[in-house]
Amino acid sequence: MQLKLRWITILIVFVVSLFFMFPLDKRINLGLDLKGGMHVILGVETEKAVQAKIDTLTGQIRKELRNSKINFAFVQKNESGKISIGLSDPAERNKVKDLISKNYPILKESGLNSDEKVIELSLDTDEVKRIKDYAVEQAVQVIRNRVDQFGVNEPVIQRQGKEHILVQLAGITDPERAVKLIGKTAQLKFYLLDENANNEETIKSGNIPPDDIILYGKKIDKVTGQIVSTIPYVLKKDAVLTGDYLLEAEVRISSQFNEPYVSIKFDPAGSKIFEEITAENVNKRMAIVLDDNVYSAPVIRERIAGGEAQISGSFTLEEAKDLAIVLRAGSLPAPVKILENRTIGPSLGQDSIKKGIWAGIIGVAAVIIFMLIYYKFSGFIASIALLSNAIIILGAMGMFKATLTLPGIAGLILTMGMAIDANVLIFERIREELRLGRTPMNALEAGFEKAMSTIIDSNITTLIAGLVLFQFGTGPVKGFAVTLTIGILSSIFTAVTLSKTIFLTLYGNKEIKKLSV
């Protein structure tokens, strides 16, 4: 009965393994080094996230001082990246400080300015750290959302260190497009034009009002797709609406010009803001700005309800699709720069697969030949366990959707050797028992029983190392850890359960005088 239960267990393991193993090309995900693709390390410019927060706070403070009827000369970010508040009346200094202390606890007075009419504020050190850390975490999530919409299987997107992000996309066919998609900041903002300052004379003189900024649009030749010229726009410094309220973004084709554009829709809160802005600024121009580039600056003809707008700019269909993807996925909290960009061609990956397979075949064949010569029929049983081990490992990888890498193949070959090592321990123990004068059947039982603790101890030690590598390793190291961990568990099963079951089936009910070991 116990032997029957053993065979049922083995059969279940093999059926499940074969089910998840085939077809190999669909069940086993290949890593970057085998399938080809791109490996990119991005650096998040976290300091710009801090400066963006200061810009936002500057606008909020300016608005709050106006609402509180406090007269001020200016509220602006100075050259050192701090917020400077210029007071019209020094007597209101304490009133302003109380307002800041109450509503903006993350801001601290620098105390370096001796002018009674100027209050200089900087972000708290802990807040700066929080902003930088959040910027990287959010960037990882945004990039992951973009890649998911791009349709890449098993992408690797993870944080490295304080400000770096690792991106590995296996099987990518257009790495240049993928890099653009990943690296685009996609900060969507809406600004009102300063109609009084938006003229050639003001722009040429550079005498821009302190509450304004100049951004540029691009005039593109529709035939060649080349930039013909840039168009300056003088905009009110504070954005009236941002992409944070964006709900949908999809590509549509203009019936008038037969060109693709991106239709966007805001959530209820954004729709309300958009409606209020358009109602208050009829016959004025509003610029649609993406990553500091003005895409269009249409005149608001009437109140716009429903929260819908469109971004047009002589896009190709692919450009419009990519823009819709990055807008849906959200904007990066800070720009990213490419620190490392490597592309691995599919032919190089195929070459690695062939070499890895041949290395495995030669290694396994050499081991089987040695086992047959040295351990005779017992070596044949060990060889069956060895090949079974490979099936179980590949089946487990298919079940857990693990990714096979070149180091993973090395881990697979290593565990095959470890599986044989377990059988060698058992066989040597059986030989030792036979030399002590035990009967073949007693020597067989004693060999498996006494070798068990050594096999378990050695494999548990390696298993712990594999789990540590899996937890803290990245890329190739993690791929090696996956096959190593699965292989260790599989080798214990095949050596202890499968090999012993075969021996018991062949010799369990027989009087044997000699073991071929």
Swiss-Prot record:
Alphabetical list of SUPFAM superfamilies matching this protein: Multidrug efflux transporter AcrB transmembrane domain
GO terms for biological process, alphabetical: intracellular protein transmembrane transport; protein targeting; protein transport by the Sec complex
One Pfam family here: SecDF_P1_head
Keywords for this protein: Cell inner membrane, Cell membrane, Membrane, Protein transport, Translocation, Transmembrane, Transmembrane helix, Transport
Gene Ontology molecular function, alphabetical: protein-transporting ATPase activity
UniProt membrane topology term: Multi-pass membrane protein
TM region(s), chain numbering: 5-25, 357-377, 380-400, 407-427, 455-475, 479-499
Function, as annotated: Part of the Sec protein translocase complex. Interacts with the SecYEG preprotein conducting channel. SecDF uses the proton motive force (PMF) to complete protein translocation after the ATP-dependent function of SecA.
Family: Belongs to the SecD/SecF family. SecD subfamily.
Protein name: Protein translocase subunit SecD
Native source species: Calditerrivibrio nitroreducens (strain DSM 19672 / NBRC 101217 / Yu37-1)
Gene: secD
